Amino acid sequence: MNGTEGPNFYVPMSNVTGVVRSPFEYPQYYLAEPWAYSALAAYMFFLIIAGFPINFLTLYVTIEHKKLRTPLNYILLNLAVADLFMVFGGFTTTMYTSMHGYFVFGPTGCNIEGFFATLGGEIALWCLVVLAVERWMVVCKPMSNFRFGENHAIMGVAFTWVMALACAAPPLFGWSRYIPEGMQCSCGMDHYAPNPETYNESFVIYMFICHFTIPLTVISFCYGRLVCTVKEATAQQQESETTQRAEREVTRMVIIMVISFLVCWVPYASVAWYIFTHQGSSFGPIFMTIPAFFAKSSSLYNPLIYICMNKQSRNCMITTLCCGKNPFEEEEGASTTASKTEASSVSSVSPA
């Protein structure tokens, strides 16, 4: 084995020289230079100061503005709540441990940090599944009388939490375990060694099938059908131009969220699967650290995409930040009025 396994850890370095120590008790500066740990701490600090305000504002603005309380936005708000869980339960812990060069909070803290990181990532994934199914039902109309309402949204939110807990909770109760990974200052599921006592192999297979492959398959199917339907509707002009434009904007926003999720999480999942299928092979701590920390940036992109690509939510956000007045909205209103007046003048002129 090219690593050192302990009661609650696996350090990706052989202990032939005797330098490997428990990541819960000693700094791990034999794995990387101290400046690398400082860089990780600075990165986590950035995610905290950027992730908390934008996710909190997303929640606050939606609660303050009644017109934003639509069923679809329930799912998007659920994403913001999950991101806040990651910020408070995971990022603050990881920043502090990175500053010290090892996981100072012990196995219990590792369980907490790993649980919140996994829970947030899984809620995001299952939210995207619910959004994909919603888009498929609304645009493709497999059920002609279906209308996505408040009850559907509440059930969708509950579903995301149940599925996320089904993935994040088992390691807390003995099916697999959370251990420090990479440079040993953040925690994730154990896919490094078989460990028959915690049934690691069966859990990793269950996780990759039920909580990664299946949801991505559902998302791919829904958007595959959706793209075909949108093309057909555009060609046949079955819907009004305004309706088509609105559906396209929402669909585009959700698709970009899916792509962003894949960009953030597929590298981490791919590296984890590689390590699982090549247990005992040699790999450096940076090999797992970079994709693991990159995946944490997912707490930023969902609210940014939602705000940037949704004009109504963007205007409400600006109104809230500007103490109840949106200066940009006035300019837009003036230009819209001017264009309408011009159009009216043109239409009133009789042909020569």
Swiss-Prot record:
Q: Where are the transmembrane segments?
A: 37-61, 74-98, 114-133, 153-176, 203-230, 253-276, 285-309
Q: Which PANTHER family match?
A: OPSIN
Give the modified residues of type N6-(retinylidene)lysine: 296
- Any coiled-coil regions, as ranges: none
Carbohydrate attachment residues? 2, 15, 200
General function of this protein: Visual pigments such as rhodopsin and porphyropsin are light-absorbing molecules that mediate vision. Rhodopsin consists of an apoprotein, opsin, covalently linked to 11-cis-retinal. This receptor is coupled to the activation of phospholipase C. Porphyropsin consists of opsin covalently linked to 11-cis 3,4-didehydroretinal.
| Full protein name | Rhodopsin, freshwater form
Task: Kindly state a single biological-process term from the GO annotations of this entry.
Answer: visual perception
Span of the secretion signal?
none
Q: How does it sit in the membrane?
A: Multi-pass membrane protein
Q: What happens to this protein after translation, modification-wise? A: Phosphorylated on some or all of the serine and threonine residues present in the C-terminal region.
Q: GO cellular component annotations, sorted alphabetically?
A: plasma membrane
Found, by tissue, as follows: Rod shaped photoreceptor cells which mediates vision in dim light.
Per the UniProt record, the source organism is: Anguilla anguilla
Low complexity bias (residue ranges): 334-352
Annotated S-S bridges: 110-187
GO: which molecular function terms? G protein-coupled receptor activity; photoreceptor activity
